[in-house]
Amino acid sequence: MIYQTDNDKLYRYLFKDRAVRGEWVRLNKTFTDTLNSHEYPRIVRNLLGEMMVATNLLTATLKFKGNITIQIQGNGPLKLLLVNGSDSQQIRALARLQDDVYDDITLSELVGNGILVITIAPTNGERYQGVIALDKPTIAECLEDYFIRSEQLQTQLLIRSGEYEGKPVAAGLLLQIMPDGTGSQEDFEHLATLAATVKNEELFGLTAEELLYRLYHEETVEIYPPSAVEFHCGCSLERSGSALLLISDDEIENILTEHGGSIDMQCECCGTHYFFDKKTIEKLKA
């Protein structure tokens, strides 16, 4: 049974005697809202859920206001998968396919010759971008390698996505040595071994407190108040109109003529339709 109180929540916690920190997140309505306007194949849905969980876990490590974008770019059946999340745990995502996808396809087959790009964008400050090879079987393993190479922080990511009680769900754990250098490799490996025993039904069905007790009942764990996670697209008539105005006047006129005097622009993330006739476009130009 799913405990509703911990749906769409992110928890941070600290192992008091080990100098290791952790995070747990579960996406229920957030994941469903993301999928509502799309008919992705099962393997793409699950990968999208994994990427959303990873983005939530990474944004929770930010020490500043801003957002993180994680995207897969490839030349396989999956051309693009993009997730954007903010420090306030608002998230949006989309995928673009360019070929048919079968159920037992591997990540490397799905993406082809692809890369994972992480863009960290502070509200105030310079953007940072890292490019990661998709040379591991899972997104979680690729991101673990990223933390070791870019931040020299031993990190474990356990991410699962699928269905529970007939509904889409994605969840995950992050375990990381404290960046102040006080944590030991031995402590981290001990906790990582315990975390690796987690089952899907535990990630998908237990409360954070119950899950952490199940995994770490002999440890002293301080759990901090949770953050709510939600799907938030951010699209609007004005933003869609700004994109439309990048097209030349002649081309806009041709499109209006071809489509009976109204241009329909649909948001890729949430599926909302925005309609522009000649009068609306003239107002946007004013």
From Swiss-Prot:
* One Pfam family this sequence matches: HSP33
What is the name listed in the Swiss-Prot or TrEMBL entry for this protein?
A: 33 kDa chaperonin
The GO biological-process annotations, alphabetized, read as: protein refolding
Q: Which family does it belong to?
A: Belongs to the HSP33 family.
Q: Which PANTHER family match?
A: 33 KDA CHAPERONIN
Kindly state which keywords UniProt assigns to this record, in alphabetical order: Chaperone, Cytoplasm, Disulfide bond, Redox-active center, Zinc
A GO molecular function assigned to this protein is: unfolded protein binding
Q: List the disulfide bonds.
A: C233-C235, C267-C270
An annotated GO cellular component of this protein is:
cytoplasm
**UniProt subcellular location:** Cytoplasm
- Gene transcribed to yield this protein: hslO
Among CDD domains, the record links this protein to: Hsp33
- What is this protein for, i.e. what is its function? Redox regulated molecular chaperone. Protects both thermally unfolding and oxidatively damaged proteins from irreversible aggregation. Plays an important role in the bacterial defense system toward oxidative stress.
What does the PTM comment of the record read? Answer: Under oxidizing conditions two disulfide bonds are formed involving the reactive cysteines. Under reducing conditions zinc is bound to the reactive cysteines and the protein is inactive.
Is Disulfide bond one of the keywords? yes
